Curated annotation (Swiss-Prot):
Induction: The genes forming the sterigmatocystin biosynthesis cluster are co-regulated and induced on oatmeal porridge or the fungal isolates were grown either on oatmeal porridge or in YEC medium (0.2% yeast extract, 5.0% corn steep liquor). Expression is positively regulated by the cluster-specific transcription factor aflR that binds the palindromic sequence 5'-TCG(N5)CGA-3'found in the promoter. Gene3D superfamilies: 3.30.70.2490, 3.40.47.10, 4'-phosphopantetheinyl transferase domain, NAD(P)-binding Rossmann-like Domain. It comes from Emericella nidulans (strain FGSC A4 / ATCC 38163 / CBS 112.46 / NRRL 194 / M139) (Aspergillus nidulans). Belongs to the thiolase-like superfamily. Fungal fatty acid synthetase subunit alpha family. Disruption phenotype: Fails to produce sterigmatocystin under conditions that supports production by wild-type. Able to grow without exogenous long-chain fatty acids. This is Fatty acid synthase alpha subunit stcJ. Residues 457-693 are annotated as: Ketoreductase (KR) domain. One of its GO terms (biological process) is sterigmatocystin biosynthetic process. Pathway: Mycotoxin biosynthesis; sterigmatocystin biosynthesis. Fatty acid synthase alpha subunit; part of the gene cluster that mediates the biosynthesis of sterigmatocystin (ST), a polyketide-derived furanocoumarin which is part of the most toxic and carcinogenic compounds among the known mycotoxins. The first step in the biosynthesis of sterigmatocystin is the production of hexanoate by the fatty acid synthase (FAS) units stcJ and stcK. The polyketide backbone is assembled by the non-reducing polyketide synthase stcA by condensation of the starter hexanoyl-CoA and 7 malonyl-CoA extender units followed by cyclization and release of norsolorinic acid. PROSITE patterns: CARRIER, KS3_1, KS3_2, PHOSPHOPANTETHEINE.
Amino acid sequence: MTQKTIQQVPRQGLELLASTQDLAQLCYIYGEPAEGEDSTADESIINTPQCSTIPEVAVEPEVQPIPDTPLTAIFIIRALVARKLRRSETEIDPSRSIKELCGGKSTLQNELIGELGNEFQTSLPDRAEDVSLADLDAALGEVSLGPTSVSLLQRVFTAKMPARMTVSNVRERLAEIWGLGFHRQTAVLVAALAAEPHSRLTSLEAAYQYWDGLTEAYGQSLGLFLRKAISQQAARSDDQGAQAIAPADSLGSKDLARKQYEALREYLGIRTPTTKQDGLDLADLQQKLDCWTAEFSDDFLSQISRRFDARKTRWYRDWWNSARQELLTICQNSNVQWTDKMREHFVQRAEEGLVEIARAHSLAKPLVPDLIQAISLPPVVRLGRLATMMPRTVVTLKGEIQCEEHEREPSCFVEFFSSWIQANNIRCTIQSNGEDLTSVFINSLVHASQQGVSFANHTYLITGAGPGSIGQHIVRRLLTGGARVIVTTSREPLPAAAFFKELYSKCGNRGSQLHLVPFNQASVVDCERLIGYIYDDLGLDLDAILPFAATSQVGAEIDGLDASNEAAFRLMLVNVLRLVGFVVSQKRRRGISCRPTQVVLPLSPNHGILGGDGLYAESKRGLETLIQRFHSESWKEELSICGVSIGWTRSTGLMAANDLVAETAEKQGRVLTFSVDEMGDLISLLLTPQLATRCEDAPVMADFSGNLSCWRDASAQLAAARASLRERADTARALAQEDEREYRCRRAGSTQEPVDQRVSLHLGFPSLPEYDPLLHPDLVPADAVVVVGFAELGPWGSARIRWEMESRGCLSPAGYVETAWLMNLIRHVDNVNYVGWVDGEDGKPVADADIPKRYGERILSNAGIRSLPSDNREVFQEIVLEQDLPSFETTRENAEALQQRHGDMVQVSTLKNGLCLVQLQHGATIRVPKSIMSPPGVAGQLPTGWSPERYGIPAEIVQQVDPVALVLLCCVAEAFYSAGISDPMEIFEHIHLSELGNFVGSSMGGVVNTRALYHDVCLDKDVQSDALQETYLNTAPAWVNMLYLGAAGPIKTPVGACATALESVDSAVESIKAGQTKICLVGGYDDLQPEESAGFARMKATVSVRDEQARGREPGEMSRPTAASRSGFVESQGCGVQLLCRGDVALAMGLPIYGIIAGTGMASDGIGRSVPAPGQGILTFAQEDAQNPAPIRTALARWGLGIDDITVASLHATSTPANDTNEPLVIQREMTHLGRTSGRPLWAICQKFVTGHPKAPAAAWMLNGCLQVLDTGLVPGNRNADDVDPALRSFSHLCFPIRSIQTDGIKAFLLNSCGFGQKEAQLVGVHPRYFLGLLSEPEFEEYRTRRQLRIAGAERAYISAMMTNSIVCVQSHPPFGPAEMHSILLDPSARICLDSSTNSYRVTKASTPVYTGFQRPHDKREDPRPSTIGVDTVTLSSFNAHENAIFLQRNYTERERQSLQLQSHRSFRSAVASGWCAKEAVFKCLQTVSKGAGAAMSEIEIVRVQGAPSVLHGDALAAAQKAGLDNIQLSLSYGDDCVVAVALGVRKWCLWPLASIIR
């Protein structure tokens, strides 16, 4: 077959094609030939070669068209309604009206009617929202797409479809593949409005599947049989494509493509990726790698990998804080008996703050002289004073082999060791250059055990000091002696840090420091960098090195040596030499030749004695060569050598497996085995100056082998001992199993089944203190504001779970169950077959006892402070087009908008279907989205799986309301349960609707909707129409009132940034005391949002997660208040609320009382330029002079307390460098100014170490924690404060506990809060027992009964609601009808009660009469002001009459004297003085004729009525009646050294209370 050449092809005219106009021709896209047109090619143009015949593919015939029907309104109506309500079309019932579908929400109804009116461009029927959708469809009839649906449909294609997917494409596919007519196509398109994809479809295939699914759903809804087919065009296109592609795979085409590539590469100057030389190099590298792997293996490489990183170093220097904490803890217990060991422990930590504490506590006063004397002396450690132990191996009845230890004789290690050396005639235990130093060593040991030795001002490096090791005990001894110790660890930072932090807090004495450094001694690089860090970065010089790092090689004999044994040899020998060599280099570089560093070599008598230990013996033998090198090499000026032959040391990492046969070694081998403590003391003694200086002249050898090297047949005897133990254990185990089988047989007839232990869930009501007749504050219940309920939702879920983690660091079984429920891991079922918890996913039963084991890890990893999900932040970059873009379809409105923005740089042409074809041309500017990788984030997030539906909130509300408002709603419901109120409507049986206030605030409000309003709108995304309202800070409290409370009281929304919650309490207290409200909801709420987090990061306020990760910090460690390494706060989200109540209302309702709000104060910080800078304006809360006592003092004095009675201070403590020093400074100055006793520091609570910083609810969570502290007496410690900042040491009025402290009770607390924008606030809280002291004993018992009934019912209701997912009972309508609303709001006596017979609410009247004391203007009454007043004051320090029995007999009645006898010795003087002051004030008030200064005052009797002082008894009553007085109101106020009484005579027509007169 001949082929025509190019020259033979007839020439055609030159045709120029453009991609913008001739895209179809350029891409060889052909349409269907017109009917009747000859589709054969014109062979006269080009004679193409003949190809082999391709078999014709059987193509399925085109689908038969389905008869088209006009589009009716119901399709569009259902789609728009479903889209607005966020439901599927199948959930929209055409028989229901818009009003019914919207649940009566007027906003949604209004929006839908507006959209439908705009869509159909015609007048809708009257009250269209009340008409069913079917009737609305009948009224509108046949329709077409309107403006609303076209706009929404265009948005779907723009935002969710892939590129080049247009309406026209979809219509073509629906016609070709599905055979749908134009109107049916429109119906499918409309269905997309209610089933919009969640995100953009990434491919055309995914888009086709999406539209095919909608088409199938459309057919099913109409009962149509739709059949998908392949069109002839598609089939032909596939065939032609296959033919077109086939030649491309030919050899000639590939060769041409390769030549083109080479030409372009050469022209552009691009280097060939690989050359022959590169290939040779790669082969050589591969050969070397194979050789390395064959010789050492991958395990060897991993074992020598580098670990050292100076950024991950942990420092511990806060010995002073640990000492203060321990002494204060001991002083809490009056039954403590001081021992010599306890005394010495504190003497070695003596410092000025500790002396003050000892002076202030009678229990510790005997320590004061010793502490003062020890301040100027270095700390010492007494070595060898421990009890010596011997091993015992026992086989239990169950066949378990256990190792025990018993005391030797003599029990003191010094005495025993000395006698053992003499008894065994052992010589040269310690020798140097042939000289026997054994006696010197023993004498030194005796001296160290009696007088102690000091390691102060010395620096030691110890490797291999893990838990249970000899090195770990040496570290303890060195820290006790005041040394600076650098310890290395190869473990992960967190577990190692926790261990050494605890070790330092127990053993660190005055001046000691502990540095924990990550390090792998098997790495040469690590060895060099470690020594460089010590000498270059820290600027230290080592006094001694103890390279004790080792690794176990048990079971490795010479025929099984592998890479791990080689790595161990490198670690224990080769790199020990390198390590000390690097020290020599550093010393020589610095010219240090007069202070040689002592190297303590860990030698061993085990030179193959035990066997099966790899290269252990060889590495120990190799170290011995340093003793000879000392004389033969040149580094004796820089190093001194001390070799220690370490004997059998029980329970270490290397010898733990041999503990079972240690008794055999002592009995049969006459070997002395040592405990870790004993061996540690012996080695520590070698570091003392007396023995260390001996090493400078010649190496010292210490033989602590315990005769192990003399045991010749050790291996065989030990093997026999192990076999004997196994035999005994097998025998005992067999007998135990036989006994168990016999026991089961005896019980086989019993039908009793074991009962699974169930976990009891509780709300956590406060314990009720016993009645105390000695507590009688001069107040009435109505004067008090108390906390009757509280709740929170935060990173740990509820306040109960947060308290467990804060105070204990772990969850209780009930805590696991509650958190698993909250995270949707379990759910409760109650049916015929099973009652209990089941798995949230598979529904299988889960026993209560199995929940911690099954879900514990998931709970702890998905709650608290943890890493945020990675998120790419979307930003836009503006680009100027350099060439025209391809055209795209869009609506006319969009086309006009684009033309208005870009002008002549956009070309618009109208299509027949009403859409427009738009092309952006060169020169136009567009913004292209790009993703910026957000830095890693950490925050305190709500537990994973938390959802408002779990609490019973309906789905339609969840979709409408901002997420943070839902958190607040759930939190408020829990707060009412914690108050014993399961139905908030119960409140209105006791108070009016207007007397319940809502003071919950926020700093940011609904940030999700704020982001949508300002960010999503710019992206033309679909934004909820009522998003604006959700951004207001008062909207969330409004939702609480609308959906749950239904009150008519004030909603005041404080905005105080991080101090919002405390500002909320301050406002509520003012409202209650002013009589505006009786119960108030207070607190704060805030959410997390990326933009906000980025703003904090730019301010350098939050922690840099990347830096923290580089320092080896886990997310849970990154919030470290008061720690020297703190670097910023960690954000968190959530809500916290409290329910405040007037005291008399709380008593009447029987509400639980968690605490008293004794006083609050707020202040600002004056002139400045920094909004977030912490200030000291709150010092005004402590301002006072001789005439005006401080607000703090006054708040405490009302309850009979003084400034020394404050026990704890809850600090704002955000973990920022500035705040955590400024805040303690403020409190220090306040306490000093108010005269707090030195040596009685406040326990500082830093809650944010476990919660992070939630902004607005911060103080609410802190207040919840303080209330829990009041109830339990447990002060939670700040476990993340690994090294309390030395700058805080001077604040002697504060102690910063790092572990929880159980006190004997808390009387009062101080809460401090700070917020951006000069918000400073403080709160004083008092224990509820002082409020209950206002009651008489019968009143107390009556309250106890009411309270018990209430909390029992609330506990049952809460657990039931939790198990049925109905904690939040959303109110759908008010408890009264519209006709009653006005009368209820206008009548202050209106109350709402639940009628139990009908289970409905009814309106009643209050039992107390309505106040009608206001007089009309024409009433002729005298001026209603009090006619008489009397004031008197008594100075307590000069009042001594209480010691005079005659004075008491003449001036106090029998009843008054009985009351005085109940007072304690301390308060007796104050009680007598206040009574006398009150009598004098009453006498002046009566204005009667005086009988003289010496007249008895017993005729004026002061008694208590409901806790308040009352008069008008005896002759005083007659005098008052004669003066026309109805009663005398008496007020007593207390200062530090004075009492003031004010008596007001009130006439019968005067109805104003004393408080209003004073104002």
